Design a protein with these regions (language model features):
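Conserved micro-motifs of the catalytic ATP-binding
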Residues: 6-9
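Conserved glycine-rich
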Residues: 95-96
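Short beta-strand/loop element within the Bergerat-fold HATPase_c
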Residues: 32-44
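Short alpha-helical Gxxx[C/S/T] motif in the catalytic ATP-binding
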Residues: 83, 87
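Short helix-loop "hinge" at the ATP-lid/N-box region of the Bergerat-fold HATPase_c
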Residues: 25-26
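Short conserved segment of the HATPase_c
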Residues: 45, 57-70
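Acidic ATP/Mg2+-coordinating residue in the GHKL
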Residues: 52
Length: 119
């Protein structure tokens, strides 16, 4: 974990949101793969970036991965499709945003952003 900057928010709920995203990354990253978590800030916002070198997100799945009960085509069938939707709700409830980007063939990247003065 590489961290810089300060963050103000609900620690428990934010930890839950980040944990759900990391769990999703773990499910789609092969054994021996890498998951990185970075934090940064500037005058406008604090940001948490989570990257993996797993299977990436298919273009068909990308617009839907934060929808409740949505399971991607690469899903192992064990999940309920709730974790990423819950993460988005937690982050939005604190005035933040979360977005996912496909880094295929080298994985996915999730960016959580909290604007200063809103949390």
């Amino acid at each position: 974990i590489h961290a810089a900057g300060a963050f103000r928010g609900d620690f428990s709920w934010t930890s839950e949101a980040i944990g759900n995203i990391v769990k999703n990354c773990m499910e789609h990253t092969p054994e021996g793969g890498r998951i990185e978590i970075d934090a940064a800030e500037n005058a406008l916002f604090s940001e948490i970036i989570i990257k993996d070198n797993g299977t990436g997100i298919s273009p068909e799945d990308l617009p839907h991965i934060f929808e409740r009960f949505y399971k991607g085509k690469d899903s192992d069938g064990k999940s309920f499709g709730i974790g990423l939707a819950l993460s988005r709700m937690i982050i939005a409830g604190q005035g933040g945003t979360v977005k996912a980007e496909n880094r295929k063939p080298v994985g996915a990247m999730f960016t959580i952003r909290f604007y200063k003065g809103t949390v």
